[in-house]
UniProtKB/Swiss-Prot annotation:
Keyword Acetylation annotated: no
Domain SpoVT-AbrB: 5-47, 76-119
HAMAP family: MraZ (MF_01008)
NCBIfam families per UniProt: division/cell wall cluster transcriptional repressor MraZ (TIGR00242)
High-level lineage: Bacteria, Bacillati, Bacillota, Bacilli, Lactobacillales
Compartments (UniProt record): Cytoplasm, Nucleoid
Primary localization: cytoplasm
Designated name of the protein: Transcriptional regulator MraZ
Encoding gene (name): mraZ
Species annotation: Lactobacillus johnsonii (strain CNCM I-12250 / La1 / NCC 533)
Amino acid sequence: MFMGEYHHNLDSKGRLIIPAKFRVEIGDKMIFTRGMEGCIFGYPIEEWQKIEAKLAKLPLTKRSARKFTRLFYSGAMESEFDKQGRVNLTMTLKEHAALIKECVIVGVSNRIEIWSAERWNDFSEEANENYDDIAEDLDDIEL
């Protein structure tokens, strides 16, 4: 399980360090793809395979299913960590998440999310203001 918030910068070659705590659970490589709300999703291989199985069941007759899978898979890449625990994300993913220098890596249960620091700050500020309302909307899970 991934949790926590970590701040790292892209290096001069555009590589990003993935926190050691996350790498222990991930292994030597993971899959990155376009995430929601302008971030990048990162999945361990086992989690990615579960998602692939679910997406394979979507009906090709549904336009939204076709659009989503095209975007989700076309933005995906497999990346191995180098000896320092860095990954080199594609330009497509960096542009999707507006990654320039300062990044925030967030653990979200079965995945990690990579955000530009600016987008993360905007998201967190807005979400924190509405935290109680968001929790109330999820009352059926009984936390």
